[in-house]
Swiss-Prot record:
Function: GTPase-activating protein for the ADP ribosylation factor family (Potential). Binds phosphatidylinositol 3,4,5-trisphosphate (PtdInsP3) and inositol 1,3,4,5-tetrakisphosphate (InsP4). Possesses a stoichiometry of two binding sites for InsP4 with identical affinity.
Keyword annotations: Cell membrane, Cytoplasm, GTPase activation, Membrane, Metal-binding, Repeat, Zinc, Zinc-finger
Every Arf-GAP domain range: 9-132
Pfam family, one: PH
UniProt domain PH: residue ranges: 132-233, 255-361
Gene Ontology cellular-component terms listed: cytoplasm; mitochondrial envelope; plasma membrane
PROSITE patterns for this protein: ARFGAP (PS50115), PH_DOMAIN (PS50003)
Localization terms from the record: Cytoplasm; Cell membrane
InterPro entries assigned: Arf-GAP_dual-PH_domain, ARFGAP/RecO, ArfGAP_dom, ArfGAP_dom_sf, PH-like_dom_sf, PH1_ADAP, PH2_ADAP, PH_domain
Annotated protein name in UniProt: Arf-GAP with dual PH domain-containing protein 2
GO biological process: heart development
Protein species of origin: Mus musculus (Mouse)
């Protein structure tokens, strides 16, 4: 066996070695990484390897299977590995800081990787980890009634638990004052059409208000995201002092479980089917629907209780009901009524069924019962 094959075999054994963490990407957790940084000593996935290529002074990457590895490189990988390197570069990651997963957008992964290895924000044991606290700056915000993005000043007051934004730079009165209590932030780069697109939502007069913003700097928008998360965690600790931090962290911000177009009919089931954009919020157990993906407010929402409370989802439509253009149907059963939807493809239907069943099969948590009043579903169409 030549050096090439022998070293490849050693690397593949390292990938599977117990207690090393090498079987998942060191940066996003994706399973079975095929690349490695031979300068840092970590195994990473293809997507994260692309980010590492951008700073060769800090990290240099090779394919585990396709590139040539000499003995010294393999020895370096053997004496390092994912868990050992994480112990150094992730020694002091704040609880509020969002650690991206495999399916997260590129800007989150890129800034996480740069924060770890380039800026080394989480390494030195004697270095105090700074809390973002208050924050002020400009973001590009989409207009409520048009598609134009305009520059707006945002001010986060962490201690007061408020986010404000202003339509005029010198304006005294803010356009909106948003309580951190009801705020969520989630990256929606495809929907917004910008690689740094962030969706901020909050409750307003019984509805969910959507703000769509971005910043040209990836670092700036991720810093805003984590500052909002820090303020949210601070609020949760005050609101639920008896709960451990580990139970509060998953509640800081959340992503939609599933989004996409479906068609729906009205409560009498005789109304025409209309195309709507749907977003499933698993934490608040709401299926929200909009006329368009970037609308400021939802047209309506369906509260999703648990199977134990009589909530179900059926594959297909009730007998005698026919959709408009789309035939792959599903029916959400609540104690008050049936909500009937059709999906553009059978694949979409399967994904919606799986997502909805996942929410309905999970019991309402005590925290959810404290913070959310059960709603049966309402809407305009």
């Amino acid at each position: 066996m030549g050096d090439r094959e022998r070293n490849k075999k050693r690397l593949l054994e390292l990938l599977q070695a117990a207690g090393t963490g090498n079987g998942h990407c060191a940066d996003c957790g994706a399973a079975d990484p095929d690349w490695a940084s031979y300068k840092l000593g970590i195994f990473i996935c293809l997507h994260c390897s692309g980010v590492h290529r951008n700073f060769p002074d800090i990290s240099k990457v090779k394919s585990v299977r396709l590139d040539f590895w000499d003995d010294s490189m393999v020895e370096f990988m053997t004496h390092h590995g994912n868990l050992n390197v994480k112990a150094k570069f992730e020694a002091r990651v704040p609880a509020f800081y969002y650690v991206p997963q495999a399916n997260d957008c590129l800007v989150l992964k890129e800034q996480w990787i740069r924060a770890k290895y380039e800026r080394q924000e989480f390494t030195a044991i004697d270095k105090a980890v700074s809390h973002p606290g208050n924050r002020e700056g400009f973001l590009w915000k989409r207009g409520r009634d048009n598609a134009q993005f305009l520059r707006r000043r945002f001010v986060l007051l962490s201690r007061e638990g408020l986010l404000k934004y202003y339509t005029k730079e010198e304006g005294k009165a803010p356009k909106a004052v948003i309580s951190i209590k009801d705020l969520n932030a989630t990256f929606q780069t495809e929907k917004i059409g910008h690689p740094h697109g962030l969706q901020i939502t909050y409750r307003k007069e019984g509805h969910t208000r959507n703000l769509f913003v971005y910043h040209d700097s990836g670092k700036e928008i991720v810093d805003w995201f984590n500052a909002l998360r820090a303020a949210r965690l601070q609020y949760l600790k005050l609101a639920f002092p008896d709960l451990p931090e580990s139970e509060l962290v998953p509640l800081i911000t959340r992503n939609y479980l599933k989004q996409g177009f479906m068609e729906k009919t009205g409560p009498k089931h005789r109304e025409p089917f209309k195309k709507r954009w749907f977003a499933l919020d698993p934490q608040e157990r709401r299926l929200l629907y909009y006329k368009n993906p970037l609308d400021a407010f939802e047209l309506g929402q369906v509260f999703l209780g648990s199977n134990e409370q009589g909530y179900e989802v059926w594959e297909d439509l009730p007998k005698g009901i026919r959709g408009n253009r789309w035939k792959a149907g599903l029916t959400v059963i609540t104690p008050e009524r049936k909500f009937i939807f059709t999906c553009p493809t059978e694949k979409e239907q399967r994904e919606w069924l799986e997502s909805l069943r996942g929410v309905l099969s999970s019991p309402l948590s005590p925290l959810h019962l404290l913070t959310t009043s059960a709603e049966t579903g309402c809407g305009l169409g």
